[in-house]
Amino acid sequence: MLIRKQGKTKLMWLPVTTSTALSAGALVTFSSGKLIAATSTTVGSDIVGVLRHTIAATDADYATARLVEVEVPVEKNVVWTADVTSGLVAADIGLYQDLTDSLTVNRGASTYDIVQCTKVLSATKGEFLLNIGVDARAKA
């Protein structure tokens, strides 16, 4: 789960894929013009932002076409707290990592470079900058 710690963001209301459960704090991307959860292979330039509220199968509007709230960074260095699969260490600071899924950083992979570690909070939690959207740094 990603939670903004500091920096400027804006809230955008975007269309979501109907009948799709998503968790608050998930990175989201578009598929056929509707939001879906980002995956471990989603490129940074395709990721829109962070979903603000959980979408559950028990929601009254779960199967309804609707707009949902997404938090989108409006400046480059917004800091986010995120869960990490395991093993985050001080040597990871400054390095780019990928996602395990839409909610979790994979510190052992750096194919897509979705986040950059700025602080280690524990072996399973850190602070990161997102490398997403149209300004995402391309993998060298």
Predicted ranges, named:
Residues 1-140:
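Surface-exposed, low-hydrophobicity beta-strand/loop segments enriched in small/polar/acidic residues
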